[in-house]
Amino acid sequence: MEELYKVKGLLNAGFVGQITYTVCLPAKCSKLDICMKFSKQHFPSADLVPLEELKEFCKKEYGISLGENDDEALDNCLHNMKTEIHLMATLNYEFIGCIHKQKLERHMIFSASELSEGCVRPDSLEGVLKVTVLVFNVLMDETPYEVSVHINREEK
């Protein structure tokens, strides 16, 4: 597949918002693959996260005050809180899909023979494509993400 574009960015801890990338598809396409990758979904191991920093985060974000003997609650926070990023796309201002499975790499694939879960097959793969990164929670500073769009041009 031909790479139409690839963008990369870093998200700060606590960021909530949307980032939209818009591009005109250069030709009618037979296949479209929109991919998003990110990392730092969960806190690293307990020995890499300062205890006071984790307690402060739990109090600030969730209103939970953790004492010295709250090992179970701290373990729960450490292993269950996550960075949550979804991916949505429109083609010619019509919704064609949104994926939010908790994977570090996600693909939205559109073709005559293949369609990703959470997507709607458009009548035609041509026109203005908008890809929106929907960010609901970022745990750690400098969380990297990457969005790429690959196409197969329709043969004439």
What kind of region is each of these model predictions?
Residues 1-156:
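Acidic, Ser/Thr/Pro
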